[in-house]
Amino acid sequence: MRIVKGDKVKYLDLEGVVISNPYMYITDMENYIDVYFSKVKETMTLKINDLEKVD
């Protein structure tokens, strides 16, 4: 399932923390995605495999 901007995602390495509606910038379509965390006002580059979509 493809993750797109505005999706709620769960970052699996952070004990399943739900990131609500992050701003995402694709860096490398296959492997990496930049996610802006509004709570900590920080952009992190994460592996797409470490993210899980939340309904």
What are these regions (language model features)?
Residues 1-55:
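Basic/aromatic-rich interaction segments and small domains that mediate binding to polyanionic partners
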